[in-house]
Each structure stands twice: as C-alpha cells, then as structure tokens.
Amino acid sequence: MSKSIDILYSSPFPSTRTGALFNAFSYPTKISPEAEAIFIACHSNIGDTILDPFGGSGTTGIATMLTDSPTESMLKKVKELGLEPIWGPRKAVVYELSPVGCLLGRAMCSTKSVIFKKYTETLLKVTSDICNEVYSIVDPEGNIGLLRHAIWSDIVVCPHCGMEIPYAQLAVQDNPLTFKEDSLCPHCGESVHLADAERVKETVNDPLLHREISVKKRRLYKLYGITGKKRWSRYATENDQTSYNSTMANRDITSSPIYPIKWGELYRQGYHYGITHLHHFYTSRNWFVFNTLWSQISQYPEDIRDALKIFLLSYNSAHSTLMTRVVAKKNNPDFVITGAQPGVLYISGLPVEKNILFGLQRKLKTFVEAFEKIESSKGEVQFVNGSSTNVLLEDNSVDYVFTDPPFGDFIPYSEINQLNEAWMGIVTDDAEEAIINPAQGKAI
C-alpha cells in the first residue's frame, strides 16, 4: 500500500471530467468518481469504512461502489501508473447538507439499470403524448414539425428615438456570426451601445400567483425544428408568437410548486428583473412540460421514484430554464447551443428554450450506462442528509476519510441548488451551510 501512496502523491493525478458517471448529473466542483475510487482502493482495505462529511453529489459513495467494480479505464490507469490497489467491497458513510446532493448519491448507488430504463421510457412516452402539442411548429415548407429549441430575445428601447427593437436584431451579425457591442437603430439610424440599452418591461398575468407582475419583455427570435428526419431553422414571425401565446393559454399547471426564490449573492438587478419565484426561470411552455413530467412520478413504484426525480433534475436547471445560452464560435455559421453557466444563475439577452423531451431522451443512455457501471458492486453506502457538525458514528469506526471541503465564498451551493430542490419540496437549510456569504451574514 505504501508504494501506491508514494506514486499517487509524486505528481498530479491524471483525471478526466468525462464518462457516464460524471456526465449523468452536473454539479459544481464535481470530481471524477473513477479517480477517487483509485485513491480509496490504494488507501484502504476490503470491508473498511470510508467517511465523506461534505458529500456534494455523492461521488465518494459512487467511488466506494467502484472499488468492488472497477471499470476498464480504472484498471488501465493503475497499470500505467504501477499502482497496487486493493479491489473489493467497502462501506461508505456520506453526509451532505443539500437534499438534492443526497438524493443524487442515494439514487446513483441503488438503482438497477433495466428497471430504470423500463420506467423512464414509459414516463417519456406518456408525457410526450400529453406535451408534444406544445412543441408542434410549422416548418419552412408549411408542414407541421417539432421544435428542437427556440432562441428568445429581450426587447430593448432605442435611447434616441424610443422605439422598441429586438436585442437580437441589434446584437447579432451574420457572415461570420458574431455578437456586436454597438449597433445602429433601424428606425433612427443612431448608434446604440447594447450594454447600456434599456430592456423593455411589460405587465403580464401570472397564472400561479394570480396577480399581475412586471417582467422583462421577450419575444421568439429563431426557431429550430425537425420534420420527419429533416432538421431546419427559420426566424420567428408574429404568427409564431401569437400561436405560442394561444397554445399556452389556460394550460393546467395547478399541481405546480409555488416557490419564492431566496435570493442571495447571485442576484443581479438587471437580468433577474421580475424573477421572484421558481417558475419565472422558465418559459411557460417548458414550465408546463417539466411540471407534467414531475407530476407523473408519483404514479410509478416507490423504489424507482428517486431515480426518476434525479433523471429529470439532471436536465432541469442545466437545460430547461431561461439560463440556457447561445454562444458564437469562430467560423461557425450558426449559434452553438449550450447549457446554463455553472456556478451562477445568469440569464442572457438571448435565452434558449430547449425541447425537454428530446433532451431527456438523449440523456437516458448516459444514466443507463452509469447505473450499469456500479449495479453489480457489493459495496454499501449510507447517505445522511444532514450537517457534518453532528456525525453520528462511533469512535474509531472510520478507516479513511475522503472529502472535498467547503469552498469559502466561491460557490453559494444552497442558492444554486434551490432551482432543483424546490421541485423536491425541501431545500437546503442554509443556517448550517459552511460558507463565506454576506447575504447570509457569514464571514471567516
């Protein structure tokens, strides 16, 4: 064991942020479970108890399972490095303050891939039958297709003539595709510095709060769809916006959670204008679709519900909200669609609305592969949703501690995680959160 430990610390350990176990669920500061498993196998023996008092997304639990079920890449890596790990089952106890982090770890370490695949495919089929109508859209040839994603645009006002203009019309330059900092108003011809251009506000009726609210005015800008096997894109028209408004009017969202956002260090007055509750982070279409998915979970066996929840939440804050973005890459003729910017709650002037059902269908394979990697392991993992200030373990019962301690003021986990935890009905108790955070009144 001492030889392996010497090798492990002689140089930076090679690790990749790839693979099904890593990619199944995005989480701030997440590390490779395969790399951690090698450390555990080199520092402990079969049957030992591993403790992680700051569990995050449950990586230590997954890594402990992997010590009894090492992947081909792990076996290859230890051979290359000349390590002598002791493979075999161990036990892990993982404490995590975040409900979603704890749920994630527990589901990843206890779900059978075949059962998960069966019920997830049913969930997606049932929800598609209900929701595909809201993603239906007319293609450039006049046929009915399905939306893949839509780019929305803030509406700004010209500081010179007072006319309203789509932000995209001013900011986007084609051939090559780039974003401009300054542009000419199409109405008066004066120069507009986009960073200073005032966003237009509008008053709308909030169907969940049952009152009028003031929000940033946004309109559909560009649509990307598929008809049969043919992919296409086109700019949105007034008819598209009218059709969207009509389609989403009076949709049943009575089962939706009504959760007031607990703002802290991440709040920005500009791009968060009008966002007071969870549903304000979504278009009305994606709120309806995600709520429909979530409400279906209670109809499935209890022992698969946690996995279904984690599956949906893996796509939620990263890809289902207005935080989804476009970027312009050199020599690329069109926008590149990406997910939410990690570690913040940023909403751009060109937010993207993805087809949630398409996205989850693609993600299904990743989850199945992740479960397959550890489902044969005889390791045991206990997840405790609570503070590590109160670890209920007997003295001398822990053989090895592997942990990723708090990051000071780097990431306000509880503020970020509430977008997922609100759907669960339980959010992180930030009174116990170890963090430097003026909004919480916490310092060194």
Regions found by a protein language model. Name each.
Residues 410:
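Short glycine-rich, flexible loops that bind phosphorylated cofactors or substrates
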Residues 2-53, 61-394, 413-441:
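Nucleic-acid modification enzymes, centered on SAM-dependent nucleic-acid methyltransferases
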Residues 57:
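Conserved SAM/SAH-binding loop
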Residues 444:
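A short glycine-rich, Lys/Arg-flanked "PGG" loop and its adjoining helix->strand segment in the class I
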